Amino acid sequence: MSKVTEITHPLILHKLAFIRDKNTGSKDFRELVSEVSMLMAYEVTRNLPMEEIEIETPVCKTKCKVLAGKKVAIVPILRAGLGMVDGMLQLIPAAKVGHIGLYRDEETLQPVEYFCKLPQDIAERDVIVVDPMLATGGSAADAITLLKKRGAKQIRLMCLISSPEGIEFVQKAHPDVDIYVACIDEKLNDHGYIVPGLGDAGDRLFGTK
């Protein structure tokens, strides 16, 4: 079964309180989501593979560790996941960015891909899927399935807030994918919103309803 990491750093929890607040406007909301994403990325990337190289300082030659291979690909789930990308790129500026857009067919309830643009070398990269909310878990699980079909092997999921139901769903669908969240909330309500949650992340990021 995959590992679930709840990142309870004081700075993250402080900023998360203002993200939740319904009186926080879109400008501040966007900035806070970006800041929390950057802070979370530090923990999410903790176990990236390393390799040893030799460099020369002004004093002598020495061996140092650097990231191995082709590094990271960040893949936001449209559209709310876009709000997390800039913060992560501040910490991992060399990362490539892919995009996945999915919706569910109302009759078949099956996922329908309406947009997918990924780095050609996605199979060689450590992939971090980002979405502010992990509610039912359906969209995240579908996005991960799509990534695996495109060849991705090392995948992590990073969300600001999750429901217990969403975590359980993704773990059952993808027991090999570790999940990182800033907070695991109480439950989903009858409308599929996380309680207490933060409302609709996409609407709050982009000022829409």
Swiss-Prot record:
CDD domains: PRTases_typeI. Pfam families: UPRTase (PF14681). It catalyses: UMP + diphosphate = 5-phospho-alpha-D-ribose 1-diphosphate + uracil. Uracil binds at I194, G199, D200, A201. Its EC number is 2.4.2.9. GO terms for biological process: UMP salvage; uracil salvage. Binds 1 Mg(2+) ion per subunit. The magnesium is bound as Mg-PRPP. Pathway: Pyrimidine metabolism; UMP biosynthesis via salvage pathway; UMP from uracil: step 1/1. 5-phospho-alpha-D-ribose 1-diphosphate binds at R79, R104, D131, P132, M133, L134, A135, T136, G137, G138, S139, D200. It comes from the Bacteria. Catalyzes the conversion of uracil and 5-phospho-alpha-D-ribose 1-diphosphate (PRPP) to UMP and diphosphate. This is Uracil phosphoribosyltransferase. It comes from Clostridium perfringens (strain 13 / Type A). The gene is upp.
